[in-house]
C-alpha cells in the first residue's frame, strides 16, 4: 500500500521551520552576547588592554580637569575607573596608580621597572641634570644613591655620636625658634610661624650639611628659602611645562614661570657650589669630616685615587654639589611643611595638644627636655606624628615615575617609558583601611594596651616606597619628633580667634598651608632651654 502525506503537511513543515529559525536566532543572539562578554573579559586581560580613563581633549588632553588638588581629582577618577587608570596631559599619556594594592604591586614588587624618571624639562634643570632625586635610573644612579644614603645616615642617625650631634643641632634651633615665636607674640599678639619654622629647620640641615647656621633675619638665607613653593609647583605632578613643551615657544605665563624656575635652581646651585669650593679649600688631609659635605668630598677623592682595578663606586667629585643640593633642599622643605602642619593641628585640636603635653610631662618630667631615648616611651606623641602625616598627606603625589620595561599592574598593560603618577593620598584616606579617614584621631594608631600599632603605622605612605623611597625618611622622622616634643614640652599654641576656622592651601609637590596666625606662649620660662643649650655649648668647647 502506498503511503501519502496529508494535505496540510507543507503548512506544518513551514510552521516548524519558522519556530526552528526563531529558536536558532535566539540561541545565536545569546551565544553572541556571552561570547562578547567573554571576549571583553579576555581583552581586558590581554597585553593590549590599556588602563581605562576619561576622554582626552585635543592638544591639552585632561590637563584642564586636573586642577590644583590633583590628588583629589585622581581619587575621583579611581572611584569611576578603578585604581589603575590613564589620563593624557597635553600629548603625554600618564598612568595613575591609586590604592595600596596597585602601588605596592608596581613600586615594591616591580621596583626596578617603575624606578625611572620621565625626561621632563624641569627635571633636567635641577642641579644641572645631576640630581639623584630627579635623575634617570641606572647602575650608576644606584651606586650614587647607596653612597648618599650611607653618608647621610653616618651624619644623622646611624652612630651614637652622630645622633648626639643631630640632637644638639635640633635643640639649639628649637631654643632659638621658641625665643623668636614667644618674642613676636608678646602682649597677646599672633604671628605667622612660617618663616621662623623654615629658618629653624633649614638651619639644622645647614649644620648637618655645611657645618654652619644663619640668623633668623639673614636676608640672603631668607631669599634662598623663599622659593620652596615655586619649586614644588613646577616639578609636581601635572606641571604644564613638562607635558606641553610647545608652551616654551611663545610668551605666556607658563614659560615665564619656567624661566623663573631655572633662575631659582641656578641660585640654589651656586649657593651649594660656593660651600663645596670653600670646603675643598679648607679640608685638612687626614682629618675627620666636619660635616656631610666633607664626608662626600673625602669619599669622592678616595674613589678618584683608588686602585684602577677596583670597580668604581660611590660619588664622583662633580656629583657632590648636586647630591648635597638634593639632601638639603628636599629635607628642609619637607620638614618645615610637616612642622607647620603639626602646629596647625595643635591649634585646631587643643585636646590633642593637651594629651601630648600630658604624656611628655609624665614621661620626661619638667626638669629636663625630651630626647630621642624617650621616643619608645611616648606612644601618643608618635601616634600624633603618624596621624598628622596620614591626615594631611602633605606629600599627596610622588615625583613622577617612568617605566623601564613593558609590564602589567592589576592586569593592565603599561608599556616601557610610560609616565606614572603615584597617588599617596589615596592610600592614607582609603576607607577600607582607615575607619572614618576624614577624622583626625591619633588614637587610631594605639593598640588596646596603649602601644603603637606598628603594622598600621607602617601603612602610612608619605615618603614613597620602592627604589625611589626617600633616603631622608629616618632623618625627617627623627627631627620631627625632636622639634614637636621640645615645642610641646615648652609652649602652648592657640589659634587666632580673629581668623576663620577654614584654611586655604597652596598645592604643588606638597600641600602647604597659606598664611595663618597663631599665638605662642611659654608653659613656664626659657630657663630650661637656655641651660640645656649652655650645657651643650660647654661640652662642645671641651671636645
From Swiss-Prot:
Signal peptide: none annotated. Keywords: Endoplasmic reticulum, Fatty acid metabolism, Heme, Iron, Lipid metabolism, Lyase, Membrane, Metal-binding, Microsome, Mitochondrion, Monooxygenase, Oxidoreductase, Steroid metabolism. GO terms for molecular function: estrogen 16-alpha-hydroxylase activity; estrogen 2-hydroxylase activity; heme binding; hydroperoxy icosatetraenoate dehydratase activity; iron ion binding; monooxygenase activity; oxidoreductase activity; oxidoreductase activity, acting on paired donors, with incorporation or reduction of molecular oxygen, reduced flavin or flavoprotein as one donor, and incorporation of one atom of oxygen. It comes from Rattus norvegicus. The record marks 395 as: Major determinant of CYP1B1 17beta-estradiol hydroxylation regiospecificity. GO terms for cellular component: endoplasmic reticulum membrane; intracellular membrane-bounded organelle; mitochondrion. SUPFAM superfamilies: Cytochrome P450. Its cofactor is heme. Belongs to the cytochrome P450 family. It is found in: Endoplasmic reticulum membrane; Microsome membrane; Mitochondrion. This is Cytochrome P450 1B1. InterPro entries: Cyt_P450, Cyt_P450_CS, Cyt_P450_E_grp-I, Cyt_P450_sf. Its EC number is 1.14.14.1, 4.2.1.152. Gene3D superfamilies: Cytochrome P450.
Amino acid at each position: 500500500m502506498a503511503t501519502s502525506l496529508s494535505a496540510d503537511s507543507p503548512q506544518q513543515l513551514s510552521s516548524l521551520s519558522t519556530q526552528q529559525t526563531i529558536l536558532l536566532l535566539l540561541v545565536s543572539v545569546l551565544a553572541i552576547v556571552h561570547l562578547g562578554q567573554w571576549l571583553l573579559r579576555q581583552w581586558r586581560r590581554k597585553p593590549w588592554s590599556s588602563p581605562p580613563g576619561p576622554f582626552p581633549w585635543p592638544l591639552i588632553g585632561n590637563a584642564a580637569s586636573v586642577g590644583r588638588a590633583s590628588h583629589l581629582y585622581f581619587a575621583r577618577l579611581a572611584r569611576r575607573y578603578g585604581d589603575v587608570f590613564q589620563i593624557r596631559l597635553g600629548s603625554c599619556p600618564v598612568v595613575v596608580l591609586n590604592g595600596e594594592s596597585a602601588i605596592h604591586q608596581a613600586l615594591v614588587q616591580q621596583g626596578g621597572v617603575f624606578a625611572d624618571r620621565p625626561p621632563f624639562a624641569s627635571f633636567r634643570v635641577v642641579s644641572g641634570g645631576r640630581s639623584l632625586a630627579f635623575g634617570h635610573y641606572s647602575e650608576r644612579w644606584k651606586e650614587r644613591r647607596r653612597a648618599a644614603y650611607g653618608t647621610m645616615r653616618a651624619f644623622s642617625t646611624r652612630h651614637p655620636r652622630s645622633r648626639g650631634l643631630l640632637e644638639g643641632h635640633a635643640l639649639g634651633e628649637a631654643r632659638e625658634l621658641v625665643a623668636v615665636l614667644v618674642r613676636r607674640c608678646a602682649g597677646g599678639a599672633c604671628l605667622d610661624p612660617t618663616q621662623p619654622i623654615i629658618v629653624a629647620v633649614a638651619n639644622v640641615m645647614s649644620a648637618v650639611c655645611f657645618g654652619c647656621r644663619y640668623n633668623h633675619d639673614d636676608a640672603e638665607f631668607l631669599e634662598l628659602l623663599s622659593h620652596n613653593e615655586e619649586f614644588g609647583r613646577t616639578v609636581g605632578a601635572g606641571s604644564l611645562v613638562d607635558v606641553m613643551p610647545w608652551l616654551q615657544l611663545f610668551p605666556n605665563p607658563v614659560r615665564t614661570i619656567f624661566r623663573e624656575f631655572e633662575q631659582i635652581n641656578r641660585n640654589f646651585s651656586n649657593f651649594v657650589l660656593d660651600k663645596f669650593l670653600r670646603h675643598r679649600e679648607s679640608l685638612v688631609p687626614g682629618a675627620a669630616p666636619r660635616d656631610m659635605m666633607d664626608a662626600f668630598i673625602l669619599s669622592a677623592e678616595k674613589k678618584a685615587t683608588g686602585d684602577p682595578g677596583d670597580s668604581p663606586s660611590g660619588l664622583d667629585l662633580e656629583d657632590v654639589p648636586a647630591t648635597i643640593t638634593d639632601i638639603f633642599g628636599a629635607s628642609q622643605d619637607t620638614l618645615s611643611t610637616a612642622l607647620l602642619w603639626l602646629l596647625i593641628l595643635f591649634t585646631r585640636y587643643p585636646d590633642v595638644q593637651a594629651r601630648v603635653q600630658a604624656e611628655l610631662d609624665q614621661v620626661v618630667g619638667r626638669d629636663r627636655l625630651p630626647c630621642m631615648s624617650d621616643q619608645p616611651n611616648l606612644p601618643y606623641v608618635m601616634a600624633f606624628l603618624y596621624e598628622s602625616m596620614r591626615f594631611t598627606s602633605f606629600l599627596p603625589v610622588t615625583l613622577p615615575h617612568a617605566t623601564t620595561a613593558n609590564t602589567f599592574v592589576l592586569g593592565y598593560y603599561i608599556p616601557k617609558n610610560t609616565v606614572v603618577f603615584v597617588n599617596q593620598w589615596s592610600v592614607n584616606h582609603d576607607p577600607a583601611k582607615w575607619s572614618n579617614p576624614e577624622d583626625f584621631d591619633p588614637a587610631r594608631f594605639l593598640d588596646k594596651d596603649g602601644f603603637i600599632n606598628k603594622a598600621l603605622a607602617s601603612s602610612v605612605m608619605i615618603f614613597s616606597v620602592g627604589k625611589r623611597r626617600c633616603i631622608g625618611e629616618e632623618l625627617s622622622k627623627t627631627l620631627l619628633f625632636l622639634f614637636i616634643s621640645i615645642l610641646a614640652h615648652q609652649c602652648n599654641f592657640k589659634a587666632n580667634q580673629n581668623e576663620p576656622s577654614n584654611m586655604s592651601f597652596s598645592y604643588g609637590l606638597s600641600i602647604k598651608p597659606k598664611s595663618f596666625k597663631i599665638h605662642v606662649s611659654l608653659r613656664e620660662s626659657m630657663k630650661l632651654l637656655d641651660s640645656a643649650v649652655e650645657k651643650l655649648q660647654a661640652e662642645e668647647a671641651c671636645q
